[in-house]
Amino acid sequence: MGKQSPIILAVTNKELRDQLSEENRKIMGAPERMDPFYGAPVILVVLANKAIPTHVYDGSLVMGNLMNAAESLGVANIWIHRAKEEFESDFGKNIFADLGIEGEYEGIGHCALGYAVEPAKKAAPRKEDYVYYIR
């Protein structure tokens, strides 16, 4: 017990937020000046300790919980990938060093938070064979 592997970097510093965006954009192969974080001012980076066998599951659950909590508060949010690649690079390793974070952490995802410019669209219909009932 007590072996929760995830940590969260709550990034509100605009300079670091923009650096994360640029690194993410490069990994994505997107055109210059494209913002993978859709202009969101707050980025919660979820990472998990590789020493724990369930670290990817643990980090994914944190991401889902962050997104559900944000939605319940009326805060727009989106899961942005490529945290793994960011934090395997020298760029990410330097962030760990600057923060004094030791250990081997894998980037799970970015939870970008902000307020939507327009209301959310109606959800698409769900696939029919999503749940199988066993009675």
Report the location of each language-model feature.
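Acidic, surface-exposed loops and disordered segments
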Residues: 1-135
